[in-house]
């Protein structure tokens, strides 16, 4: 189950899914993709929400919606890990409701309480919450495939930045300085050594 609010994210998801389908053609898995953004002024008299806090609820709601379509008990696995999974506030701007808590254990536990209250036979789990991204990359069972696809993946919080700078033709770009980019760079360096991360950073 995937969501995108702009083109760069959607293109990355589509390409990665296509490559994984080709590599693991004997496994049965499909992609449910939802592209959704909200127009400014959608609710009269309410100012626009320029944060991404609401995406926490949206992501899980989409996953639960897909799970209920199976017609049986389901487990929604959310593969987030490391610092981003726990959302440790690094500065005052990240305290309280100023930042998303998409995969924080407390937030996920409240979601499971909500499912139980609503009588939905499903559960949210994050099996990798206690692993760093570097540990996950180093432990990958198919490191060759991971290295071949890593430049097609998108971690950046500002994927449109390269377009605004007039950079074209290099494919998916990462700004290199936002929190997800810094964690990506540290993780791939920890897993593969210095100089082996082929990600283009703007």
Model feature map: region roles:
Residues 1-202:
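Nucleotide-activated chemistry modules centered on ATP-dependent adenylation/adenylyltransferase
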């Amino acid at each position: 189950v995937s969501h995108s609010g702009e083109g760069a994210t959607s293109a990355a998801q589509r390409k990665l899914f296509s490559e994984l389908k080709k590599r693991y053609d004997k496994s049965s898995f499909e992609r449910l993709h939802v592209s959704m953004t909200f127009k400014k002024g959608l609710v009269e008299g309410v100012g626009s929400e320029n944060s991404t806090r609401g995406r926490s609820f949206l992501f899980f709601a989409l996953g639960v919606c897909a799970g209920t379509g199976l017609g049986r008990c389901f487990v929604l696995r959310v593969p987030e890990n490391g610092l981003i999974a726990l959302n440790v506030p690094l500065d005052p701007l990240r305290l309280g409701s100023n930042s998303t808590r998409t995969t924080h254990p407390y937030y996920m536990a409240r979601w499971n309480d909500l499912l139980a209250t609503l009588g939905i036979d499903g559960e949210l789990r994050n099996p990798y919450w206690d692993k760093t991204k570097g540990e996950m990359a180093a432990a990958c069972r198919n490191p060759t495939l991971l290295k071949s696809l890593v430049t097609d993946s998108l971690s950046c919080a500002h994927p449109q930045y390269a377009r605004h700078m007039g950079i074209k033709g290099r494919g998916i770009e990462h700004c290199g300085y936002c929190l997800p980019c810094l964690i990506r760079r540290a993780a791939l360096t920890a897993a593969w050594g210095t100089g082996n991360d082929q990600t283009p950073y703007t």
